Curated annotation (Swiss-Prot):
It holds the Pfam family NusG. The lineage of its organism: Bacteria, Bacillati, Cyanobacteriota, Cyanophyceae, Synechococcales. The keyword Transcription applies. The gene is nusG. GO terms for cellular component: cytosol. Residues 154-178 form the KOW domain. Belongs to the NusG family. Participates in transcription elongation, termination and antitermination. HAMAP family: NusG. This is Transcription termination/antitermination protein NusG. Keywords: Transcription, Transcription antitermination, Transcription regulation, Transcription termination. The keyword Transcription regulation applies. It comes from the Bacteria.
Length: 205
């Protein structure tokens, strides 16, 4: 049997597949990761393929955002923007369900040349290796919250607390991993580099 352009190219994948399936990466439209996950989970049950499409994940890492007023806001950030990970037992039906989900672009894999005619060939979905899967989910499980701040070198700031309260200066260094920055403050008429906590400063427009 040969496949047309609108059919699945995954016949080669119908080999020995463990009952727990393999993980595949799927490229999706930017900003549509959550929408794809929800749509796909609904389609899995509607189209009765829950025995083959087993899990849909958007790997995320915890972050702490420092707002301009110094408030800390807990949140999450996608590790692989534009991608969704799917654990599945690959066959033609499961491939079609994923591929035809709105905002899905394609599986990550190797492009197969067409045997005839013009145009691009099919992408043969390639499962992630055990090592890749282990690294991804270990990163998710063990990751300490990353501190994000709406601040960069060159920004003008005002100090909100501490001995330099009400001083203003320009940021010359940002250290997110330490939740600190350095700014040049005018002290006794001289510009002096001072290290400050993120929570001690406010960005000035």
């Amino acid at each position: 049997m040969s496949f047309t352009d609108d059919q699945s190219p995954v016949a080669e994948q119908n080999k020995k597949t463990p009952s727990e399936g393999h993980w595949f990466a799927v490229q999706v439209a930017s900003g549509c990761e959550k929408r794809v996950k929800l749509n796909l989970e609904q389609r899995i049950h509607t189209l009765d393929v829950a025995d083959r499409i087993l899990q849909v994940e958007i790997p995320k890492t915890p972050i702490v955002k420092i707002r301009k007023d110094g408030a800390r806001v807990q949140g999450e950030e996608k590790i692989f923007p534009g991608y969704v990970l799917i654990r599945m037992i690959m066959d033609d039906d499961a491939w079609q369900v994923v591929k035809n989900t709105p905002h899905v672009i394609n599986f990550v894999g190797s492009e197969q040349k067409r045997h005839y005619g013009r145009g691009r060939g099919h992408v043969l979905p390639m499962p992630l290796s055990h090592g890749e899967v282990e690294r991804i989910f270990r990163h998710v499980d063990e990751q300490e919250p990353v501190v994000k701040i709406d601040m960069e070198i060159g920004d003008h700031i005002m100090v909100l607390s501490g001995p330099f309260k009400d001083f203003e200066g320009d940021v010359i260094e940002v250290s997110p991993e330490r939740s600190k920055l350095k700014a040049l403050l005018s002290i006794f008429g001289r510009e002096t580099p001072v290290e400050l906590e993120f929570t001690q400063v406010e960005k000035q427009n």
